[in-house]
């Protein structure tokens, strides 16, 4: 898992997300506490439970983006789910236990990649030997059995040198590779994904591990052989246990749109996709044991981060038990004009950088001036104020409208430099921004 300090985590998040310092700090502290807990003695470690977080803020201010970036930094099993996709147990739809199953699947995949990477050097050696066996077949005795040579022949060593230098990369060879497992696609109703995956694995194992001769260039064969040999060096049972340990000790679940499962007013009849889901989430967040195809997983030390806009509902509309299990509250602020300006220029891959790169593929050089950036930010903020406030997502709409003409004519503008300043922005957007009806439908 990540050993970054809270300051380093916030610094990394700053490269992609503007503002929202409180949310970044809370998430960074929660992530660091995962590492701190693992440094404790085993007895105390079991007593330290994660402090789950509830992020509250209007749409488009960076809640989901924080989760996306955190997933890359965490180096731990991580899954992001939408609260609206689940229903109460016993009704048609996904049940909340599938969150932990999906998290465990992600952990198995992550641990497998790490194990293969750890065995890569040995796998490369074995793959090299298999290719050399094809190029220079080993000597056989009178009974047709391969003789074990004490020392590699001079010819084999010469070919090994050429292979490592890449001189044989384009030479074609025929080599036996493990045949791809039989592809079986089973469509199952929601909530029965576990049974589907078990049936699929059963059908795939029916064929056994068959070898299939394939004709490939040496550089392509080497890649496939390295993967095959590395997979052989990995113990599946150890891998499953390591994955379950990783989920139990370091797993992070991000639940988005949690405000959409708040109860709205008085309603008769069962509320299976709202309050029912909240009730089902309680044992997961508090700590329970979930059965997965890889084994039993305890959720006591999984960190849960929930987020919601809470424009219609309020955090107090969540059932009290769930509120108590999300003790850390972080409020994200609505974005201002100056935030929009920073969003357009400061992140590593800001929208303006993306548009410049896209147009450069057609030979068109785009220049955004400071006055142009400021005017775009003002236009986006103005439309947000007069219609629905969708935060930074409005910048995509405004910029797409602004760049439409250039994008359409780009192939005819090759070699030209187009400067987008305040006058250019005003000319293309002022009429739309000023007319509230037009901006409501177009921007």
From Swiss-Prot:
GO biological process: protein unfolding; proteolysis involved in protein catabolic process
Matching InterPro entries: AAA+_ATPase, ATP-dep_Clp_protease_ClpX, ATPase_AAA_core, Clp_ATPase_C, HslU, P-loop_NTPase
UniProt-annotated binding residues for ATP: 18, 60-65, 256, 321, 393
Reported induction: By heat shock.
Compartments where located: Cytoplasm
Quaternary structure annotation from Swiss-Prot or TrEMBL: A double ring-shaped homohexamer of HslV is capped on each side by a ring-shaped HslU homohexamer. The assembly of the HslU/HslV complex is dependent on binding of ATP.
Function in brief: ATPase subunit of a proteasome-like degradation complex; this subunit has chaperone activity. The binding of ATP and its subsequent hydrolysis by HslU are essential for unfolding of protein substrates subsequently hydrolyzed by HslV. HslU recognizes the N-terminal part of its protein substrates and unfolds these before they are guided to HslV for hydrolysis.
Protein name per Swiss-Prot or TrEMBL: ATP-dependent protease ATPase subunit HslU
């Amino acid at each position: 898992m990540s050993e970054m300090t809270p300051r380093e985590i916030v610094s990394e998040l700053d490269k992609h997300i503007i503002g929202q310092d409180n949310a970044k700090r809370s998430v960074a502290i929660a992530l660091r506490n995962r590492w701190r807990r693992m440094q404790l003695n085993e007895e105390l470690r079991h007593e330290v439970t994660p402090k789950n977080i509830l992020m509250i803020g209007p749409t488009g201010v960076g809640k989901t983006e924080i989760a996306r970036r955190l997933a890359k930094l965490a180096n731990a099993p991580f899954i992001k789910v939408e609260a609206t996709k689940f229903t109460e147990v016993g009704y048609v739809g996904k049940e909340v236990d599938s969150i932990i199953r999906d998290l465990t699947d992600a952990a198995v995949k992550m641990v497998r990649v790490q194990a293969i990477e750890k065995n890569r050097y040995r796998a490369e050696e074995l793959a090299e030997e298999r290719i050399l066996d094809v190029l220079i077949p080993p000597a056989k005795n009178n009974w047709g059995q391969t003789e074990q040579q004490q020392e590699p022949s001079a010819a084999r060593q010469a070919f090994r040198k050429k292979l490592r230098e890449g001189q044989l990369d384009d030479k074609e060879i025929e080599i036996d590779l493990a045949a791809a497992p039989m592809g079986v696609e089973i469509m199952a109703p929601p909530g029965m994904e576990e049974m589907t995956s078990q049936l699929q694995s059963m059908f795939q194992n029916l064929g056994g591990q068959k070898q299939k001769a394939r004709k490939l260039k040496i550089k392509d064969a080497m890649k496939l052989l390295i993967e095959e040999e590395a997979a052989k060096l990995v113990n599946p049972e150890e891998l499953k246990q390591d994955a379950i340990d990783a989920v139990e000790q370091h797993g992070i679940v991000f639940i988005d749109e949690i405000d959409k499962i708040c109860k709205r007013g008085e309603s008769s009849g069962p509320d299976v996709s709202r309050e029912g889901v909240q009730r089902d989430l309680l044992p997961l967040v508090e700590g329970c044991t979930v059965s997965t195809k890889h084994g039993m997983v305890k959720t006591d030390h999984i960190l849960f981060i929930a987020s919601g806009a809470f424009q219609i509902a309020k955090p107090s509309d969540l059932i009290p038990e769930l509120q108590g299990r999300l003790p850390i509250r972080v409020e994200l602020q609505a974005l201002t004009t100056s935030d929009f300006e920073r969003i357009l220029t400061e992140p590593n891959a800001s929208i303006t950088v993306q548009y410049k790169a896209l147009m450069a593929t057609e030979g068109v050089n785009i220049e955004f001036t400071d006055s142009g950036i400021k005017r775009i930010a003002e236009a986006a903020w103005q439309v947000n104020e007069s219609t629905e406030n969708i935060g930074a997502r409005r910048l995509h709409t405004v910029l797409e409208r602004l760049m439409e003409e250039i994008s359409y004519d780009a192939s005819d503008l090759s070699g030209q430099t187009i400067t987008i300043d305040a006058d250019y922005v005003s000319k293309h957007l002022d009429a739309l921004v000023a007319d509230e009806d037009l901006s409501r439908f177009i921007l």
